[in-house]
Design a protein with these regions (language model features):
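C-terminal beta-signal and terminal closure region of outer-membrane beta-barrel proteins
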Residues: 15-25, 70-94, 177, 189, ...
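Composition- and surface-driven signal marking solvent-exposed, interaction-prone regions
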Residues: 1-6, 43-47, 61-64, 149-156, ...
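Conserved small-residue
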Residues: 18-24, 28, 35-130, 161, ...
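Flexible, surface-exposed loop regions and adjacent strand-edge segments
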Residues: 3-13, 61-71, 166-175, 270-281
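Flexible, solvent-exposed coil segments and beta strand-coil junctions
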Residues: 3-15, 112-122, 207-222, 273-280
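Transmembrane beta-barrel outer-membrane domains
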Residues: 11, 21-25, 129-133, 226-233, ...
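Extracytoplasmic gating/loop element in the C-terminal half of outer-membrane beta-barrel translocons
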Residues: 158-251, 255, 274
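Membrane-embedded beta-strands that build the outer-membrane beta-barrel scaffold
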Residues: 26-36, 44-52, 136-142, 147-155, ...
Length: 302
């Protein structure tokens, strides 16, 4: 495993990349193909792929900062998966709607947090691996005379994702507000029914010059993690092969028409994602998904 380590100090760089860890991994994968029905006019075939993989870092020679361990890509410690996601322990909102946390000293705080800490990490909460442990697909092909229908589903389980880091102590008129803001703290007592912090006003920012730490910590806290599990309708295609007797007058060997739709929708995903796509995420959180694609194909054989 490649990572940053402190150099001897004789060169220009204080840190350098090196092999910093040892790890072990194991997994299994299998494919099952079946012919469910086969008659003169109708066929139904299925393909099922299942893959399970896990890994664990057994020895680590790198002191990562807290900010690296709580980012969306994940980091690691000995005894955990290679790409593990850790979070700051969110303890709910205070009476002013501000988020509170357990810091590196074990104290309850709003903004007394050190994201550059490399030693004290016991306060971090392990969420899970950012890489899925189970992946696979399930495809079904149906054929009736000249018609054919293909349904292809992909699935992934066992990982967690960091939600978009959209919360700030200050916003501008150009800021795009997330859906969660509908349920934010607005009145005293709301801290009993919501975990979405208040939109901090000017007075709050004046009273706490480090209030940005609180909202940044909220973005990387236990409140902003969702399961990465999903089942996706990856592809649906419908085609027709024209009969030979229809195309012979045109002196064609074959003629087919196919309509294909890709990346259609999620059959299942964590409701906490609020419409975000768990399959496409970046360092900060969940990224924009691949758009739906529709393709019409005409094949002509001369």
């Amino acid at each position: 495993m490649i990572g940053l380590v402190n150099s001897a100090g004789t060169g220009v760089k204080i840190t350098k990349y090196a092999n910093v860890a040892s790890m072990k991994s194991h997994g299994v994968e299998f494919t099952l193909s079946t012919k469910n029905i086969k008659t003169k006019d109708f066929d139904w075939n299925s393909d099922f792929i299942f893959s399970h993989a896990k890994n664990e870092v057994t020895d680590l020679h790198s002191n990562s900062r807290i900010i690296e361990m709580i980012s969306g890509t994940g980091f690691t410690m000995a005894g955990y998966p290679v790409r593990s996601l850790f979070s700051i322990d969110f303890q709910g909102l205070n009476q002013y709607g501000q988020p509170t946390f357990i810091n590196e000293s074990g104290n309850l705080t709003v903004s007394d947090l050190n994201f550059q800490e490399t030693i004290k990490k016991e306060h971090l909460v392990y969420e899970g691996p950012t890489d899925p442990t189970i992946t696979g697909s399930f495809g079904n092909t149906f054929r009736y005379k000249g018609f054919n229908l293909n349904l292809f589903i992909t699935y992934s389980f066992g990982n967690v994702v960091r939600l978009d880091p959209v919360f700030k102590n200050k916003y501008s008129d150009l800021t795009s507000m997330p859906r969660e803001f509908k349920n934010r703290w607005t009145l005293p007592g709301d801290e009993q029914v919501t975990t979405i912090p208040v939109i901090a006003d000017k007075l709050m920012n004046q009273q706490d010059s480090q209030l940005n730490y609180a909202y940044n910590a909220y973005n990387y806290s236990t409140a902003r993690v969702a399961k990465g599990d999903f089942i996706r309708m990856k592809e649906i295609s419908f085609g027709y092969d024209f009969p030979k007797k229809w195309i012979q007058p045109w002196k064609l060997n074959n003629l087919s028409l196919k309509l294909q739709a890709t990346n259609l929708f999620l059959i299942y995903a964590d409701k906490k994602l609020n419409g975000q796509d768990p399959e496409f995420f970046n360092t900060g959180g969940v990224a924009s998904p691949v758009p739906k694609q529709f393709t019409l194909t005409l094949r002509v054989g001369l």
